[in-house]
A protein has these predicted regions:
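Short N-terminal helix/helix-N-cap motif within the alpha/beta-hydrolase-1
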Residues: 18-19, 133, 186
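Alpha/beta-hydrolase fold active-site loops
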Residues: 6, 141-142
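Primarily recognizes the serine-hydrolase "nucleophile elbow" in alpha/beta-hydrolase
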Residues: 93-140
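Serine-hydrolase catalytic machinery in alpha/beta-hydrolase-like enzymes
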Residues: 1-94
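Short beta-strand/loop motif that positions the catalytic acidic residue
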Residues: 145-147, 151
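C-terminal catalytic histidine-bearing segment of alpha/beta-hydrolase fold enzymes
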Residues: 157-203
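Alpha/beta-hydrolase-fold catalytic nucleophile elbow
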Residues: 40-41, 99, 123-126, 146, ...
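Conserved alpha/beta-hydrolase "nucleophile elbow" surrounding the catalytic nucleophile
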Residues: 12-14, 96-101, 148
Length: 203
C-alpha cells in the first residue's frame, strides 16, 4: 500500500501460513484506515503438513522451549526486517504493530520481552510468554493479550501469567479472556484488535 501511515504484521501459528491470517485485514481496514498489512510465512517448514513454523515443536518441553525461541530470533528478525524495509517503516517503528497467534504470539512477545523490536503495539492471541530470562521489555509498547477461555491447545492461564509478568516489568498490558472460545481468533477478538490499535498505534 502506497503512503501507508501504519503497518500491521500478522504472525501465524505452527503449521499455518501468512495467507491464513491475511484475510483478517479485511475487517480491520475500517478501524485502521491508511494501514498496510503484511503476513509473512515463518521461515521453517512444518514437517507434519503443508504449513510453516517459527521453531520446531518436535519434543518441545518447558525446559527446552526458551532455548528454541532464542535460536529462532535471528530468522524472525530477518523476516520482520525485510517487511519493514519493504514498507519503508524502519524509522517509524512506533507505527508498526505485531498481531500474533499461538506460536506467532510467542515470537511477538519475545520480540518485546527481549527489547529487540520497540514497535508501536502488540496484540497477542492464544499464546504464552516463554522467552529466556532475563527479560528486558521496552516499556513504551502497549500490549493486548487475548485468549479463549476454552482453549484446548494453550490454556488461558498462560495469558493470565504473561499479563502478571509483563505488568510487573512495567509494560502497559491489557488482557481479555473470552468465554467459550477455543484456540482461534474469534470475531469478537478481531473487534478488540481494531479498537486497541486504533487507540494505541501512532498514525
Amino acid at each position: 500500500m502506497q503512503d501507508a501511515t501504519r503497518l500491521v504484521i500478522f504472525l501465524h501459528g505452527v503449521g499455518s501460513s501468512g495467507a491464513d491470517l491475511l484475510p483478517l485485514a479485511g475487517p480491520l481496514r475500517h478501524a485502521l484506515p491508511g494501514t498496510a498489512f503484511a503476513a509473512p510465512d515463518a521461515p521453517f517448514p512444518f514437517p507434519y503438513g503443508m504449513g510453516h513454523q517459527w521453531f520446531s515443536i518436535a519434543g518441545v518441553t518447558e525446559d527446552n522451549r526458551a532455548g528454541r525461541i532464542k535460536a529462532a530470533r535471528a530468522d524472525f528478525d530477518r523476516v520482520i526486517g525485510e517487511i519493514i524495509e519493504t514498507h519503508v517503516f524502519a524509522d517509524k517503528l512506533d507505527r508498526v504493530a505485531f498481531v500474533g497467534f499461538s506460536q506467532g504470539t510467542i515470537m511477538a512477545l519475545d520480540a518485546l520481552a527481549s527489547g529487540r523490536w520497540p514497535v508501536g503495539a502488540i496484540v497477542a492471541f492464544s499464546g504464552r510468554l516463554a522467552s529466556p530470562y532475563p527479560l528486558s521489555p521496552g516499556k513504551a509498547t502497549p500490549v493486548l493479550l487475548v485468549h479463549g477461555a476454552a482453549d484446548s491447545v494453550i490454556p488461558a492461564a498462560e495469558t493470565v501469567k504473561a499479563t502478571a509478568i509483563l505488568q510487573g516489568l512495567g509494560v502497559d498490558v491489557e488482557s481479555r479472556i473470552l468465554p467459550g472460545v477455543d484456540h482461534t481468533i474469534s470475531a469478537e477478538g478481531i473487534e478488540l484488535v481494531g479498537e486497541f490499535l486504533a487507540g494505541r498505534l501512532s498514525n
